[in-house]
Design a protein with these regions (language model features):
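Carbohydrate-binding surface patches
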Residues: 345-400, 438
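Aromatic/acidic polysaccharide-binding cleft in carbohydrate-active enzymes
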Residues: 259-334, 339-351
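C-terminal motif of bacterial Sec signal peptides marking the signal peptidase cleavage site
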Residues: 25-26
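Acidic (Asp/Glu)-rich catalytic clusters
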Residues: 53-58, 82-89, 102-118, 132-142, ...
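Conserved, mostly hydrophobic/aromatic
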Residues: 95, 214, 252, 281, ...
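Boundary/entry segment of secreted carbohydrate-active catalytic domains
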Residues: 37-101
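C-terminal beta-strand-rich structural cap/linker in extracellular carbohydrate-active enzymes
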Residues: 416-448
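Noncatalytic carbohydrate-binding groove/subsite architecture in carbohydrate-active enzymes
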Residues: 122-132, 164-286
Length: 448
């Protein structure tokens, strides 16, 4: 409300001066508003943060598998004919195995090292001096040592110097850590913290400072999709032991294929869930994921889920999950030194419910956008596969892209389709997203 008339009646002697003052005040307000508008127009708009690509090879390097190379009465006994050549064929660079004192076992680890596969060894009560001696013997072939494996489970009967879980676990981890740290030859070897069989038992163990890398065994329960419980259960419990800042590895995770068991899923569902599990954990910053396990240990005669976790059947024939992972690794591997990473100005529109994504880049400048539906591909109650219809979405890109090449690793290493768009520029594409990884290779226009 303008109070100028009241002021004028009260101060008639000063009417002229007040009139001038009011006029000048109004003018100044108008100028201020005009300046404000002008300034706002001149300021650059706040730029949205564009999705930043991660190194394609860092994704490939984040995958490992569990092995049991000393179980020579199982399929692992066929090291030369199946295990070694199939590990090489898969293309992984990391395995996890037990810390056994066995020269034949050591020789196998050294052989794998010569073809680019490093090992982490688990020690669950071995004398700490023995751990140091083993680490020295296998120097260069092992990349980390790991503390007690699921010592909270009665099944493993863990005990150290008469102490069981949790006291014995803490004591052993501390003494193993100390022995490795004081020896000049092993002090730089990373040490992985203990794993829990049941995540909630992390509360009993508490924070453990004697290690460099956190650990979790993140098996999705009851045939559920890979994201089930990862954010609400597995990672929080692991962080109870490791704290908030140390890198986190999942040293065991996966699915078995004995479908009569509550935890079992079909091989078809495994080819969908296992690559998605890897992607989902990578998206959450889990630095390494070790699938359990590489091969079915024995032919399934009695119906045992434990014998059906393999990516390979016991005769060495590949399950669909093995082939899918092999194709994904072959497509995305890109070893070499670090390089500048780009961002991608893009947006998915349409029905994007449950459509998840990962953006990667190779050193040649090509970007790889991986899309999948994070949905239930297996009905655990009915024990059957679920047919998931592709989700139709639109990919809109402001970053200049000259070509898009699509791959479906579950089917082939070869392209499914490609698009060059109009005038050599792809701005918008209709995409059908399945419940398994769809890899879109995006070639920047500047490369043409």
């Amino acid at each position: 409300m303008n109070n100028f008339p009241k002021l004028l009646n009260r101060y008639k002697p000063y009417a002229l001066s007040l009139l001038i003052a009011n006029f000048l005040f109004a003018c100044s307000q108008q100028v201020a508003v005009t300046e404000s508008i002008f300034t706002a127009q001149q300021k650059p708009s706040v730029q949205k943060k564009l999705p930043q690509a991660r190194s394609s090879d860092s994704f490939v390097d984040s995958l490992g598998v569990n092995t049991h190379l000393t179980y020579t009465d199982t399929a692992y006994g066929k090291f030369d004919n199946i295990i070694k050549p199939k590990l090489k064929e898969l293309g992984i660079r990391h395995i996890r195995d037990g810390g056994y004192q066995d020269q034949t076992f050591f020789d196998k680890i050294k052989q794998l090292n010569r073809i680019g596969i490093k090992t982490i060894l688990i020690f669950s009560g071995n004398p700490p001096q023995e751990v140091v001696a083993t680490a020295k013997t296998l120097k260069g072939a092992i990349e980390a040592v790991e503390g007690p494996n699921e010592s909270d489970l009665e099944h493993f009967k863990f005990s150290y110097n008469g102490q069981k879980f949790p006291e014995g676990t803490r004591t052993y981890q501390k003494e193993m850590f100390t022995e490795l740290e004081v020896d000049p030859e092993t002090k730089s070897l990373p040490i992985i913290l203990p794993s829990m069989g049941w995540g909630e038992n992390a509360q009993k163990l508490g924070y453990v400072p004697w290690g460099d890398i956190g650990n979790m065994h993140s098996y999705p329960n009851l045939g559920n999709p890979p994201t089930e419980d990862i954010d609400s259960y597995f990672i929080p419990h692991a962080r109870t032991i490791t704290g908030k800042t140390k890198p986190l590895w999942s040293t065991e995770t996966g699915y078995h294929n004995y479908i009569k068991d509550d935890l079992g899923i079909s091989e078809r569902a495994g080819a969908r869930y296992i690559p998605r599990l890897w992607l989902e954990q990578f998206n959450r910053g889990v630095k390494r994921v070790y699938l359990y396990e590489f091969i079915n240990q024995r032919p399934d005669k009695e119906g045992d889920g434990q014998n059906n976790y393999g990516l390979l059947r016991s005769d060495g024939s590949p399950k669909p999950s093995f082939t899918t992972l092999k194709n994904l690794i072959s497509l995305l591997k890109d070893p070499g030194s670090s390089f500048p990473l780009k961002s991608l100005d893009y947006k998915l529109s349409g029905n994007t419910t449950d459509v998840h994504q990962t953006l990667l880049q190779k050193r040649d400048g090509n970007l790889y956008l991986i899309l999948w539906q994070e949905v239930r591909s297996w009905d655990n109650k009915k024990k059957k596969d679920v047919a998931i219809a592709d989700r139709k979405v639109t990919l809109n890109m402001n970053t200049p892209i000259s070509q898009v090449v699509a791959y479906q690793p579950i089917r082939s290493i070869n392209p499914s389709w490609r698009s060059t768009g109009k005038a050599g520029r792809v701005k918008q594409l209709s995409i059908s997203v399945p419940d398994h990884p769809l890899v879109l290779k995006l070639v920047p226009a500047s490369k043409k």
